[in-house]
Amino acid sequence: MAQEQTQRAGGGEDDETTGGDGSAGQERREKLAAETDDLLDEIDDVLEENAEDFVRAYVQKGGQ
C-alpha cells in the first residue's frame, strides 16, 4: 500500500522532460490560461451586476 501512495497524479512538467513536444504543452497552457481568464471575467461580470444576490445565495448555502 505504501508503494501506491508514492505515485503522483498530474505532473505537467513531466511531459516536457520525457521527450514530449514542448510547443504542444505551451499551446495547451496558453489555451487553459485564456479559458481561465474568460471564466474569471464572467464571474466578475456576474458579481458587478448581482453582488448582493450572489452573497445572499452563498450565505444561504452555508458559506461564511
From Swiss-Prot:
The keyword Coiled coil applies. Keywords: Coiled coil, Isopeptide bond, Ubl conjugation pathway. The modification Deamidated glutamine is found at Q64. Residues 21-58 are annotated as: ARC ATPase binding. Is modified by deamidation of its C-terminal glutamine to glutamate by the deamidase Dop, a prerequisite to the subsequent pupylation process. Residues 24-52 form a coiled coil. GO terms for molecular function: proteasome binding; protein tag activity. InterPro entries: Ubiquitin-like_Pup. Protein modifier that is covalently attached to lysine residues of substrate proteins, thereby targeting them for proteasomal degradation. The tagging system is termed pupylation. The N-terminal unstructured half of Pup provides a signal required to initiate unfolding and degradation by the proteasome but is not needed for pupylation, while the C-terminal helical half of Pup interacts with ARC to target proteins to the proteasome. This is Prokaryotic ubiquitin-like protein Pup.
